């Protein structure tokens, strides 16, 4: 068995005693086991086999110079591994990774018997490559040092049966080699370009180098640093950009938040209703007065409205405004309302007249229609907003009454008198009878229920303004114009009398106050007048004209509403002395009048203290 080929058996386990084949021989393991003759003389057989190897004469000179030195004693053998490790030629096994460059790194002599590559570079001497490792046994024989190859053991420092060495280099050769390397390095640094100074192409300067991958020697540190720095800088720039954009937009929103939008906003309801709230109302003054009760609006000389006055009152609508709906039925209703006949019959005309053309002076006018129409308003939106009724899909507006005696009554027929053909009609317009106006109904109510001025004032209630169809029978007698005028005259006389009494009382108080400033004795007369005047409305006026208001003078002294204690009388005397004679008479009234509450019967237009 050749010495260079050392084998070891396959280890089943490396956990201690489980693998007895992989066990190193030592003094402890061999202490109690005596060696036989074959085991002690096993190295002799190895010497004989090594002597039979072929010996080349060309290597004789080099072999004498590069002779392996073997220690003679065990003490010297312990120093051999240290010297060989310093030279860098000791290698136990060929262990390397797949990235090791085989050209620049050496391998162990155990893997090859023919040649051994040294640490010197390719530029060194050539005779180093031809050297072959030699293994010479130790001549000294010891009982505990002999081993055999049959045991498949691996030699260690303690088990020194033979020494594994490599040819050593003399110090003279090493010094010459180092000087040669330094000379070449200086020349290359002087005459070479900077690109050739890369670490990848440089030769190793040390005798021993670690086995490492070529990727470790790559100059990638700075490249990785700058690439990471670029990525981080880009992220920071993006964050700064977003922050600046947010700040800018917040500033713009803050500046525009306080600004008011000058353009008017149109809501959905305004758009549907045809911009009603933005357009001037087309109701005229006459149409507003038509809703006022007849008792206040009526004048002695009344004239019937004509078509010309109605057209003047109406204001033309804007051409750009649209209607609410554009269905065929709404268009027909609007057309029938706008194109009605505005020439109405007088009160003396009867409904039995033939509907033919009649001569009115020198001009001919068509017979009036039996339908009641209001004065035409060109705005369809205004027509829809007016109070009206619908009969058989016909719109009858009720906002304006051109003539009092031209109103057609609307009555509901009894179920017994209805015909089968007219059962679908809710209302029937009777053209043979005239519908009384609101003014006539109010006047008749006032004249029939009141016998005096007080009864007239108490009879005006909200119940008298009900619908005419519910509160007025059809066969009710119609009052004449003279009765209405008489009622209005009596009401006006009552109001004038009350106002005149109040004014006269204040004038008398003012005159008495001026006299009281000159003489203190006249204050008694003033107090008597005040008691008399202040007690009268509480006893008469409030009970007669204001039944809902309770009297407020419940004082036990009997001095009226304003005088309830002697302190107030003393204050009144002192204040009357301090007042100036040039002051206004209305402002110079005593302070007691300020506490008197105004009665409802007193006119609203006067200013009270």
UniProtKB/Swiss-Prot annotation:
GO terms for cellular component: cellular bud neck. This is Altered inheritance of mitochondria protein 44. Its main location: other. The gene is AIM44. Residues 300-330, 342-370, 537-584 are annotated as: Disordered. It is found in: Bud neck. Residues 315-330 have a biased composition (Low complexity). Belongs to the AIM44 family. Residues 349-363, 552-569 have a biased composition (Polar residues). It comes from the Eukaryota.
């Amino acid at each position: 068995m050749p010495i260079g080929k050392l084998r070891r058996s396959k280890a089943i386990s490396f956990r201690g005693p489980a693998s007895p084949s992989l066990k190193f021989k030592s003094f402890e393991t061999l202490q109690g086991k005596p060696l036989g003759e074959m085991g002690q003389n096993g190295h002799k057989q190895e010497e004989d086999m090594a002597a039979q190897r072929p010996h080349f004469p060309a290597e004789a000179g080099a072999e004498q110079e590069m002779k392996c030195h073997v220690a003679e004693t065990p003490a010297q053998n312990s120093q051999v591994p240290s010297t060989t490790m310093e030279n860098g030629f000791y290698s136990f096994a060929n262990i390397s990774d797949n990235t090791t460059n085989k050209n620049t790194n050496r391998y162990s002599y155990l893997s090859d018997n023919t040649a051994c590559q040294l640490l010197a570079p390719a530029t060194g001497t050539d005779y180093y490559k031809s050297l072959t490792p030699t293994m010479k046994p130790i001549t000294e024989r010891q009982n505990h040092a002999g081993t055999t190859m049959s045991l498949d053991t691996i030699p260690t420092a303690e088990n020194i049966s033979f020494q594994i060495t490599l040819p050593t280099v003399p110090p003279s050769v090493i010094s010459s080699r180092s000087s040669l390397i330094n000379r070449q390095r200086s020349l290359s640094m002087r005459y070479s370009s900077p690109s050739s100074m890369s670490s990848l192409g440089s030769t190793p300067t040390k005798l021993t180098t670690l086995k490492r991958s070529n990727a470790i020697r790559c100059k990638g540190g700075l490249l990785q640093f700058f690439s990471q720095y670029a990525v981080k800088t880009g992220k920071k720039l993006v964050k700064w950009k977003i922050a600046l954009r947010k700040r800018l937009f917040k500033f713009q929103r803050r500046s525009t938040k306080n600004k008011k939008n000058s353009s008017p906003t149109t809501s959905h309801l305004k758009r549907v209703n045809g911009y009603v709230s933005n357009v001037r109302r087309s109701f005229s003054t006459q149409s507003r007065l038509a809703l006022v009760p007849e008792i206040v609006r009526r004048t002695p000389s009344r004239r019937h409205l004509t078509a010309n006055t109605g057209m003047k009152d109406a204001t033309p609508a804007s051409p750009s405004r649209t209607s609410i709906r554009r269905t065929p039925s709404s268009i027909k209703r609007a057309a029938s309302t706008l194109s009605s006949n505005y020439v109405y019959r007088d009160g003396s005309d009867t409904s039995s007249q033939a509907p033919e053309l009649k001569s009115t002076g020198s001009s001919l006018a068509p017979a009036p229609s039996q339908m009641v129409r209001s004065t035409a308003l060109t705005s369809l939106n205004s027509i829809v907003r007016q109070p009206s009724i619908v009969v058989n899909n016909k719109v009858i507006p009720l906002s304006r009454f051109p003539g009092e005696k031209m109103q057609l009554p609307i009555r509901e027929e009894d179920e017994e008198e209805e015909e089968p053909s007219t059962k679908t009609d809710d209302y029937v317009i009777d053209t043979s009878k005239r519908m009384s106006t609101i003014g006539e109904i109010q006047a008749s109510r006032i004249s029939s229920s009141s016998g005096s001025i007080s009864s007239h004032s108490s009879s005006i209630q909200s119940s008298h303004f009900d619908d005419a169809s519910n509160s007025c029978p059809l066969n009710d007698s119609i009052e004449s114009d003279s009765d209405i005028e008489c009622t209005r005259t009596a009401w006006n006389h009552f109001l004038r009398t009350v106002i005149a009494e109040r004014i006269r009382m204040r004038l008398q108080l003012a005159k008495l106050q001026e006299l009281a400033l000159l003489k203190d004795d006249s204050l008694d007369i003033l107090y008597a007048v005040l008691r008399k005047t202040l007690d009268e409305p509480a006893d008469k006026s409030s009970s007669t004209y204001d039944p809902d208001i309770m009297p407020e003078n419940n004082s036990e002294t009997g001095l009226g509403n304003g005088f309830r204690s002697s302190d107030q009388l003393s204050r009144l005397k002192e204040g009357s002395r301090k007042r100036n004679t040039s002051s206004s008479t209305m402002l110079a009234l005593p302070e007691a009048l300020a506490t008197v509450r105004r009665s409802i019967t007193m006119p609203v237009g006067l200013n009270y203290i």
